[in-house]
């Protein structure tokens, strides 16, 4: 096999969920694809790191020249309800339900000492600043996955909010039992909507 083809297969196999057999199929697909398609794909891959940035408010993704994402800029959204999620993909999945019109805060991970992810690695400071700046009561929805890491993360958020002398009440809610055995990424739309609609105050 040509070295460049082997190199491409190896690179593709590093993508999440792609094993060597699938990587080989994709490499041969690209080998037989139109050159314009390949160049466009290569350009998009190259630009993804240089032309996409993080929203300064919620840490969602936006175009490089923008300070805030489309959700944060949307005044029709409920600014006093903030869904805290682990990553951008969780936001996308919730948004695909077309039901909820609140705002978000992306922490970037969950507390996980075994993976060397600690409190200072996450965007807690920015979350608490958003709560403190609010001029009304706020609801914080812990839209998180049912695992040990997120139990620790949720507990930290709850404890920190309770310790602070906030001017307005902060209501903290968790997803209902509908999502007790499902990760947000894998939950079907109805299960996720029910889990969010029937969220419980902690």
Where are the predicted features?
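Short functional micro-motifs and their immediate structural scaffolds
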Residues: 62-64, 77
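Extended, structured, electrostatic nucleic-acid-contact surfaces
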Residues: 1-16
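Conserved phosphate-handling catalytic cores of large alpha/beta enzymes
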Residues: 169-202
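Histidine/lysine/aspartate-rich catalytic loop segments that bind and position anionic ligands
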Residues: 94-114
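Short cysteine-rich clusters marking metal-coordination/redox-active sites
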Residues: 55-58, 69-72
């Amino acid at each position: 096999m040509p070295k460049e083809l082997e190199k491409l297969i190896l690179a593709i196999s590093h993508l999440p969920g792609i094993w060597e057999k699938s990587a080989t199929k994709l490499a041969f697909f690209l080998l037989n694809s139109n050159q314009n398609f390949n160049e466009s794909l290569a350009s998009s891959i190259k630009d993804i790191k240089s032309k996409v940035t993080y929203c300064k408010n919620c840490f969602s993704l936006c175009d490089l020249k923008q300070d805030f994402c489309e959700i944060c800029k949307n005044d029709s959204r409920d600014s006093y309800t903030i869904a805290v999620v682990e990553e951008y993909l969780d936001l996308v999945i919730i948004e695909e339900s077309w039901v909820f019109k609140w705002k978000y805060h992306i922490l970037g991970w969950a507390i996980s000492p075994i993976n060397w992810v600690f409190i200072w690695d996450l965007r807690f400071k920015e979350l608490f600043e958003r709560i403190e700046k609010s001029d009304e009561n706020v609801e914080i929805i812990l839209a998180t996955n049912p695992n040990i890491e997120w139990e620790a993360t949720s507990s930290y958020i709850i404890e920190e909010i309770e310790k602070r002398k906030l001017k307005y009440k902060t209501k903290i809610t968790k997803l209902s039992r509908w999502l007790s055995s499902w990760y947000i990424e894998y939950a079907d739309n109805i299960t996720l909507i029910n889990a969010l609609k029937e969220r419980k105050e902690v």
